[in-house]
Each structure stands twice: as structure tokens, then as C-alpha cells.
């Protein structure tokens, strides 16, 4: 599939025209393993609004024509929820010194083409522009034997 994806970095409020598309994208991607999350457009719009209302927040969008196929977010850690900040505080980190990379979500057909790398590059550039020296993110970890984990079968002679 030829890729003609545009990467667009927007300040928080500038992403608001995309909120419905971003909400649906988050619901679609987060429904799958490892997230296993079932959200609603209403909740997602409220969640996205927290980024739009936060000074220093960034949305990095991946657009295939007019279709939003991916997004990534970031904000100063000091603006994050206590739930997100608490592990960093417990480890001795000052939230004022950290830029937090929120989610990166990308439709499956667009994975493996360097878009995720661009998400990191754009957020790092934004954090550096704001004067941050440190960036961080959180990840979902599931057990290796989780029943929803896809099993990758090794290629064997039977496949030849």
C-alpha cells in the first residue's frame, strides 16, 4: 500500500476540530490487545480536552488525506493527573523537569512505516522547544501468557 501520510504537530487547542476523529481512533486502537479498553466518544472528547486546555501540550497527527490514521500526545508532566505523576514522585523525579509522552495510536495498516518514530521525534522536538531535558512515557504490560495475546508462530518447513 503506498503511503502518503502527512504528520502534523498542533498545539493543544488547535487539535480540537479533530476531536471526534481522534476519539474514534483511540476507541478503535485501545479496544485491541494490550489495552483491552472500551471507551466512549463522550469520555474520549473530555480526555482530549485536557490536552487542549494544557499549556505546552502537543498533538501529533498522522493524516492520510483527510482521514486521521494516527495520533500521539504530550504535555508537561506537572499538568498530568496525580495517578500518572505518583510513580515518578515516588522514584524521586520532579514533575516540573519532565515532559510526558501520552499515547501513540496508529491504525494497524499504517504500522511499520516509520510513523511511530516520527511521533517520538515530533514530541521530543516539542519538549526541547519548551526547555525540557527529560521525557518519559508509560506503557501497558500484560503477562506473556495473557489469553488475548496473539501468538506469533515461527515459520517452519511446512510453510515452505
Regions found by a protein language model. Give the residues of each.
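Conserved N-terminal entry element of GNAT/NAT acetyltransferase domains
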Residues: 1-20, 24, 28
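Conserved beta-hairpin
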Residues: 57-72
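Conserved acetyl-CoA-binding loop-helix of GNAT-fold acetyltransferases
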Residues: 103-106, 112-129
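Conserved GNAT acetyl-CoA-binding A-motif
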Residues: 98-101, 127-150
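A short helix-loop-beta-strand connector motif used in the catalytic cores of GNAT acetyltransferases and
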Residues: 49-61, 77-82
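Conserved acyl-donor/pantetheine-binding loop and adjacent beta-alpha core of acyl/acetyltransferases
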Residues: 72-104
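Conserved GNAT-fold acetyl-CoA-binding loop/helix
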Residues: 27-48
Amino acid at each position: 500500500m503506498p503511503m502518503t501520510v502527512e504528520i502534523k504537530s498542533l498545539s493543544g487547542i488547535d487539535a480540537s476540530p479533530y476531536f471526534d476523529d481522534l476519539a474514534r481512533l483511540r476507541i478503535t486502537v485501545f479496544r485491541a490487545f494490550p489495552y483491552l479498553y472500551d471507551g466512549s466518544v463522550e469520555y474520549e472528547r473530555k480526555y482530549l480536552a485536557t490536552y487542549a486546555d494544557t499549556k505546552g501540550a502537543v498533538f501529533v497527527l498522522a493524516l492520510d488525506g483527510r482521514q486521521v490514521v494516527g495520533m500521539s500526545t504530550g504535555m508537561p508532566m506537572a499538568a498530568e493527573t496525580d495517578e500518572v505523576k505518583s510513580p515518578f514522585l515516588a522514584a524521586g523525579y520532579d514533575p516540573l523537569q519532565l515532559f510526558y509522552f501520552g499515547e501513540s495510536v496508529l491504525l494497524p495498516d499504517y504500522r511499520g512505516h516509520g510513523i511511530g518514530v516520527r511521533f517520538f521525534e515530533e514530541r521530543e522536538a516539542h519538549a526541547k522547544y519548551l526547555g525540557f531535558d527529560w521525557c518519559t512515557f508509560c506503557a501497558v504490560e500484560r503477562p506473556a501468557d495473557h489469553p488475548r495475546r496473539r501468538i506469533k508462530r515461527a515459520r517452519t518447513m511446512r510453510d515452505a
